[in-house]
Amino acid sequence: MSHPVEIDPILLSKVSKPARYVGGEWNSVVKDHDAVKLTVAYCFPDVYEVAMSHLGLRILYALLNERPDVAAERVYAPWPDMEEVMRSQGYPLFSLETKTPVRDFDMVGF
């Protein structure tokens, strides 16, 4: 497993809705990447609030994570204020659950 992105809390406090990026919400699934055969970055090309209202995303996320050999994690488009922070600090696009950079997943799906 790669090293998770460590977001500086001070920088996170400068974005309008930091809760979009911290994860840990009810029904989220966190698995050890070393304990599964396949890791999936399940991406949605919009911000967190839009993605979480999408029923298809929630169904596929649950179905993938029902498999003991698969770890699926969600990735959303950052809002422009967070995108600016990420670019200025060199943060890669990362998953919500474990803050793993997207480039480190076995598979990327949209």
Kindly give the residue locations of the regions a language model identified.
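A short, structured N-terminal alpha-helical element that caps or precedes a catalytic domain
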Residues: M1-F110
